[in-house]
Structures are given as C-alpha cells and as structure tokens.
Amino acid sequence: MSTSQPGACPCQGAASRPAILYALLSSSLKAVPRPRSRCLCRQHRPVQLCAPHRTCREALDVLAKTVAFLRNLPSFWQLPPQDQRRLLQGCWGPLFLLGLAQDAVTFEVAEAPVPSILKKILLEEPSSSGGSGQLPDRPQPSLAAVQWLQCCLESFWSLELSPKEYACLKGTILFNPDVPGLQAASHIGHLQQEAHWVLCEVLEPWCPAAQGRLTRVLLTASTLKSIPTSLLGDLFFRPIIGDVDIAGLLGDMLLLR
C-alpha cells in the first residue's frame, strides 16, 4: 500500500521526502543559495510555444491593431499624456487578450526541457557563489497557467462577439478610473460609464435573451484580470524579442504616426 500522503507532490518520494538522488547530492549545494524549487507535477511543469516565431508574429499584429484602436479614440488622445501612459500600463494585458480573442489566435505548447538535478550539480562552477552577478533564469510559464489562458479565450469565442461589441468592451477596460496616479480620474470614470452604456445598447439588454448575454459578457471580461501580464510577456514575446516593456512599446508605437 502506498505511504504517500494525500495531495503529496509526486515529484517527491514516499511520505513527501525528497527523491534519493537529491538527498545524496544535496550536500554539495548547501553552500550555494538555491533558487526557488519547482514542482514537477504535470500541471506545474514549464512549457513553451510549439511555434514561437509564428505565434509571436501574430501577437505583434494584435499589438498593432490595439494601437490602431487607440488612435481612433479621440477621448483617449485628449487625456493628459501621463494618464495615457498609466492607462496603458494598467490595461494592456486585458486589451491584448481581447485582441487575441477577436483575431482567434490559437497556439499550442509543449513541455520545456528541464535540466536534471545531477546535471546542475555537475555543471555548477565553484566560483559562481562568489558573486558572479548573474541572476537565475526566470521560470517559464506553467502548463496550468497557459491552460487557464486558453480557457479564457475559448469563453470569449463561445460568445461570438461582433467587432462593435469587442470595441465597446475594450472601451470599458481602457478607461479604468481605479488606475493609481491618474490626473483625470473623474473624467475617465465618465468615459468608462459611456462605454458601458454603449455596450448595453449594442447588446439590447431590454430583450430577455440579451440580458443573459450581457451578464455572460461582463463575467467573461472579469476573468481577464486573472491573467498576469508577466505570463503574456513570457509566453508570447520573451522567446523571440526578449524582455520588453509592452506598455512602453505600445506608447512608442502610438507616437509613430
């Protein structure tokens, strides 16, 4: 009979003890600060895009269309430049996700290769603990995080939103008066209300069937906030163009008329 505890990580041995190989070799690592350990359960294993170049190109196309959307919003351009930058910083993730959904961008991931503990120990240089100045590699996206992202996109596809509905929804997300540091927060709040009213008019909420649709749209849109922007950058952009401030990139693209 198995002695493992319920919920114990299968990456470890019986009774949640580390694997034998790790126990035998860990003594050589005691003098070296170890990075945060990673669970190797399937849902938490790191993954990477199967077609990074194609997917990154499609993601950049979505950013370009997002810039085009912002350029066609006089109410956005009339805001103070500092507020424009803060709104981009606070909402580029949900706007990008709406663009992925609207363009029906699909992608597949595969498990990323993970160096074995033995390989890490054998390749570890003694001088590395003496302050080489190199930071450990940032963890790659997990399978669970990517699957949740795909689930959110599929929820939008099931709604079959029209281009006008997508545009109204983007407006409700863009004009967020709760973003810290806004100079015109009150005015931005009014813009958000206007975008919400237009969305309601487009969905015709006085129709009983449309009322349920409006609720589903708003609930689905609320899930976008659960997707961290770090996941979007690490999954769609970092493999090809490296670490990039996407909000800053959008701001630069807006200046290129």
Curated annotation (Swiss-Prot):
Subcellular location: Nucleus; Cytoplasm
GO terms under cellular component: chromatin; cytoplasm; intracellular membrane-bounded organelle; nucleoplasm; nucleus; protein-containing complex
PTM statement from Swiss-Prot or TrEMBL: Arginine methylation by PRMT5 enhances repression activity of metabolic genes in liver in response to bile acid signaling, by increasing interaction with cofactors.
InterPro entries: NHR-like_dom_sf (IPR035500), NR0B1/2 (IPR033544), Nucl_hrmn_rcpt_lig-bd (IPR000536), Nuclear_hrmn_rcpt (IPR001723)
Family: Belongs to the nuclear hormone receptor family. NR0 subfamily.
Example GO BP: response to glucose
Subunit details: Interacts (via N-terminus) with NEUROD1 (via N-terminus and C-terminus). Interacts with ID2. Interacts with RORG, NFIL3, NR1D1 and BHLHE41. Heterodimer; efficient DNA binding requires dimerization with another bHLH protein. Interacts with RARA, RXRA, THRB, NR5A1, NR5A2, NR1I3, PPARA, PPARG and EID1. Interacts with HNF4A; the resulting heterodimer is transcriptionally inactive. Interacts with DDX3X; this interaction disrupts the interaction between HNF4 and NR0B2/SHP that forms inactive heterodimers and enhances the formation of active HNF4 homodimers.
Cited function: Transcriptional regulator that acts as a negative regulator of receptor-dependent signaling pathways. Specifically inhibits transactivation of the nuclear receptor with which it interacts. Inhibits transcriptional activity of NEUROD1 on E-box-containing promoter by interfering with the coactivation function of the p300/CBP-mediated transcription complex for NEUROD1. Essential component of the liver circadian clock which via its interaction with NR1D1 and RORG regulates NPAS2-mediated hepatic lipid metabolism. Regulates the circadian expression of cytochrome P450 (CYP) enzymes.
UniProt keyword annotations, A-Z: Biological rhythms, Cytoplasm, Disease variant, Methylation, Nucleus, Obesity, Receptor, Repressor, Transcription, Transcription regulation
Effect seen on changing residue 195 to S: In early-onset obesity; Japanese population; slight decrease of repressor activity
Stored SUPFAM superfamilies: Nuclear receptor ligand-binding domain
Chain positions found as Symmetric dimethylarginine: 57
Name of this protein: Nuclear receptor subfamily 0 group B member 2
Disulfide-bonded cysteines: none
Main location: nucleus
Occurrences of domain NR LBD (ranges): 16-257
Known tissue expression: Liver. Low levels of expression were detected in heart and pancreas.
Domain of life: Eukaryota
Disease involvement: Obesity: A condition characterized by an increase of body weight beyond the limitation of skeletal and physical requirements, as the result of excessive accumulation of body fat.
GO molecular function list: nuclear retinoid X receptor binding; nuclear thyroid hormone receptor binding; peroxisome proliferator activated receptor binding; protein domain specific binding; protein homodimerization activity; protein-containing complex binding; transcription corepressor activity; transcription regulator inhibitor activity
